[in-house]
């Protein structure tokens, strides 16, 4: 249904049952597949609450590669518990000839989370600098622009404003399994409509959607997720090309990396301003605290637990 219509189709998965994707990758090898991988061995397993998750994901990814998958990769959520693994994870992905994408902790109704914070913001931000430098050293254009995305991650981690304004509800939307269409998956108040009751055009051209797009312009969340940030980087006239600001940043700093010169991060990021969080209890890992029983929700159930304020700063 979607393959002939979507320019890019991505399946994001925990990677624990890669065999379920084999038939898709065989038939549609250009389908983008990303497995969540938060670190090596026990680091990944503890963060994600998985038994032998690291080994299963890597083996599954290699199997999809054998079957002819052309756009395969891992994705990591940068945080205190895995930051020292991130550069090595990137190099590991390079060795396996698969992609590597990053994001950082976010709070959102979709995730049922409002206590995700980076505890040592400065330490984590400085480690991301190393990842940016490594990406700029490669010969892959995609990695150069991922380096810019990671510059935006540093701003997010430090609590600064976004590098580029958000375009939620205009350039992208979030559709949940029950056909509700949201401008994004962070704010539950940005519900645009429902595809069971309305057509796509009715939803996107409605007065409610225009009102929500105005709310997005005033949003102070400062999220920086890969998919949404990448969309905001695109040139509105020629979507296949980047906007001028990220383009020239990449040109200048790729040249510096090629010549062996350091990237002047202090020129782009104000490290003198770091948001100080209220005292937040450190998160427990699922494998350290309890066993979580997963189950499927029905359409009639309440799907999201709105627990307090969702804030990303």
How would you describe each model-predicted region?
Residues 185-313:
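Flexible mid-to-C-terminal extensions adjoining Fe-S/redox cofactors in radical SAM and related proteins
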Residues 16, 38, 105-107, 197, ...:
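Residues that form or immediately flank small-molecule/cofactor binding pockets and catalytic motifs
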Residues 12-18, 78-82:
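Short beta->alpha connector loops
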Residues 2-7, 27-38, 42-172, 176-182, ...:
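Radical SAM enzyme [4Fe-4S]-AdoMet core and its adjacent flexible, acidic
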Residues 21, 35, 93, 100, ...:
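Generic structural signal for small/hydrophobic residues in well-ordered secondary structure
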């Amino acid at each position: 249904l979607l393959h002939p219509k979507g320019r890019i189709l991505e399946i994001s998965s925990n990677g624990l049952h890669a065999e379920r994707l084999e038939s898709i990758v065989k038939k549609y090898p250009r389908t983008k597949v990303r497995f969540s991988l938060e670190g090596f061995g026990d680091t990944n397993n503890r963060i994600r609450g998985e038994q032998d998750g690291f080994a299963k994901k890597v083996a599954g990814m290699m199997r999809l590669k054998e079957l002819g998958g052309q756009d395969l990769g891992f994705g990591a959520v940068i945080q205190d518990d895995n930051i020292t693994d991130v550069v090595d994870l990137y190099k590991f992905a390079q060795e396996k000839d698969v992609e590597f994408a990053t994001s950082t902790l976010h709070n959102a109704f979709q995730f049922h989370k409002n206590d995700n914070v980076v505890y040592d913001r400065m330490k984590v931000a400085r480690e991301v600098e190393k990842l940016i430098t490594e990406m700029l050293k490669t010969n892959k254009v995609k990695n150069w622009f991922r380096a810019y995305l990671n510059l935006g991650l540093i701003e997010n981690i430090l609590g600064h404003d976004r590098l580029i304004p958000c375009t939620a509800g205009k350039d992208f939307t979030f559709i949940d399994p029950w056909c509700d269409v949201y401008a994004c998956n962070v704010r539950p108040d940005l519900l645009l409509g429902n595809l069971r009751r309305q057509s796509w055009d009715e939803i996107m051209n409605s007065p409610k959607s225009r009102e929500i797009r105005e709310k997005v312009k005033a949003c102070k969340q400062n999220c920086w997720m890969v998919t949404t940030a990448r969309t905001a980087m695109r040139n509105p006239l020629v979507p296949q090309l980047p906007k001028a600001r990220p383009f020239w940043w990449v040109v200048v700093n790729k040249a510096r990396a090629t010549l062996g010169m350091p990237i002047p991060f202090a020129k782009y990021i104000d490290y003198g301003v770091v948001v100080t969080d209220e005292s937040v209890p450190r998160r427990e890992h699922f494998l350290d605290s309890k066993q979580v029983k997963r189950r499927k929700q029905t359409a009639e159930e309440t799907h999201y637990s709105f627990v307090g304020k969702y804030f990303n700063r």
